[in-house]
Amino acid sequence: MQPDRDTLLAGAQALGCPLSDTQADALLAYLGLLQRWNQVYNLTAIRDPKQMLVQHLLDSLAVIAPLNRVAGSAPLRLLDVGSGGGLPGVVIAVLRPDCQITCVDTVAKKATFIRQVTAELRLPQLVARHARVEQLTDGPYSVITARAFASLADLVKLTRPLLAPGGCWMAMKGQHPQAEIDALDADINVFHVEQLSVPGLDAERRLVWMRPRSVASS
């Protein structure tokens, strides 16, 4: 596991979120759980451990520095929509233990897996929900995020009732989603589209930040 640990530590450092030993241990334990469960429950199409580390852990770690910059260091409530195996929700929970994080997915086995992660990694602030996001009533959330979930317009439509006043959406995308941005309602302000560089990943990554225009910065 040492090469994986070195890759993780170096990647996190390059992403501006250096890991403590405890955080690195937790993320590698999570990766091990994901690999074991994936053999039976098909949580992710990626099966190679090294690819999992880059395409799941480092890809999710790439949002930590931007999240800290935009949302600040104060505790917040975050909703991870279509979380799958807990990405990026579990990774954020490890790096931001002060935050209350809810991972929601329509697939029961994925929610069950996240509950197992919560228990084994001792992350009491991480909650898994097996539900459609539009069925949730436990908002509001300061930040709503999604990775490979749906179009920006659908994300906003399904989750807007759950967004706290002054809150924002943080959508993880690949190439610059100009067509999706153009399809948003006029009252949604895309206040930043950030290009991410994930160590070891030869693919484009963008982080799209949105908020209702009524609270957009002038």
From Swiss-Prot:
UniProt xrefs under Gene3D superfamilies: Vaccinia Virus protein VP39
SUPFAM superfamilies on file: S-adenosyl-L-methionine-dependent methyltransferases
Protein name: Ribosomal RNA small subunit methyltransferase G
Keywords: Cytoplasm, Methyltransferase, rRNA processing, S-adenosyl-L-methionine, Transferase
Annotated catalysed reactions: guanosine(527) in 16S rRNA + S-adenosyl-L-methionine = N(7)-methylguanosine(527) in 16S rRNA + S-adenosyl-L-homocysteine
Species whose genome carries this gene: Leptothrix cholodnii (strain ATCC 51168 / LMG 8142 / SP-6) (Leptothrix discophora (strain SP-6))
Broad class of the protein's primary localization: cytoplasm
GO molecular function per UniProt: rRNA (guanine-N7-)-methyltransferase activity
PANTHER family documented for this protein: S-ADENOSYL-L-METHIONINE-DEPENDENT METHYLTRANSFERASES SUPERFAMILY PROTEIN
InterPro entries: rRNA_ssu_MeTfrase_G, SAM-dependent_MTases_sf
Lineage of the organism: Bacteria, Pseudomonadati, Pseudomonadota, Betaproteobacteria, Burkholderiales
An example Gene Ontology CC term for this record: cytosol
The protein's role, per its UniProt record: Specifically methylates the N7 position of guanine in position 527 of 16S rRNA.
Binding site for S-adenosyl-L-methionine: 82, 87, 133-134, 147
Cellular compartment(s): Cytoplasm
Key word Methyltransferase present: yes
UniProt family annotation: Belongs to the methyltransferase superfamily. RNA methyltransferase RsmG family.
UniProt cross-references to Pfam families, sorted A to Z: GidB
Record EC number: 2.1.1.170
